Design a protein with these regions (language model features):
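Gly-Asp-aromatic-enriched flexible segments
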Residues: 90-213
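Acidic/His/Gly-enriched intrinsically disordered linker/tail segments
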Residues: 1-93
Length: 213
């Protein structure tokens, strides 16, 4: 309930929860969310497993040491954290929810078209194609994947339009969406804003880029 409100905590807020704060249900829940994230994120799980070695340090030094261990990954972790708390639900997979890179098997096609392969089992995948605010372009998609099953013999096969047997946030389950990641923005919140407010695509959609990215 605290997501997307003034009570939302970023990664550094999580680390700065005082010891007395764990008597508060709100802070306790946020701390466990942080543990789930750090324990399962591909770039933090090994470091997280070594935290008992830092337990003898005072709170301030513990936090500094922990942040220093993440080095150049901190900005990436901040983005992934925001995506995590926006989507977290029962059964959520942190590794699959992290930003990843879309593959480009065919390179650039004729007429300025570019082809990418998107993995249906992962969340946002970056194409590394730059767009300018107001630029219009069309995205077409094809393929088939399974998004669920009634039983082992009845898989829910799906195409990029999604299936209306179940909806997620007002859209058919499995429907293709697009978002603009603005890595030039100053904060992680501004960088992933376009991913938290995705554009509907399905099998085909024309986008007028709301921002550059």
């Amino acid at each position: 309930d605290a997501r997307n409100t003034e009570n939302e905590l970023d990664l550094e807020d999580i680390l700065n929860i005082p010891s007395a704060g764990f008597n508060n249900v709100r802070y306790y829940a946020w701390a466990w969310a942080g543990c789930e994230f750090f324990q399962n994120h591909p770039k933090t799980k090994q470091i997280f497993s070594k935290l008992p070695e830092l337990a003898k340090l005072d709170e301030d030094r513990f936090n500094r040491e922990f942040l220093d261990l993440h080095g150049n990954n901190l900005e990436e972790l901040k983005r992934d954290w925001l995506l995590f708390i926006n989507e977290i639900d029962y059964g959520y997979s942190v590794p699959r929810g992290c930003l990843s890179k879309a593959s480009s098997p065919g390179g650039q096609l004729n007429s300025g078209q570019i082809k990418f392969r998107i993995s249906a089992e992962r969340s946002w995948q970056v194409t590394e194609q730059n767009v300018q605010q107001g630029e219009r372009f069309r995205i077409k998609s094809s393929g088939e994947y399974v998004v669920g099953q009634s039983n082992p013999q009845t898989p829910w096969k799906c195409q990029p339009n999604g299936i209306t047997i179940q909806y997620h946030r007002g859209r058919p389950l499995g429907r293709l969406q697009a978002g603009i990641l603005d890595l030039n923005a100053k904060t992680a919140e501004q960088q992933v804003k376009g991913l938290l407010n995705p554009l509907d695509i399905g099998l085909s959609g024309v986008i007028s880029a709301p921002t550059s990215g």
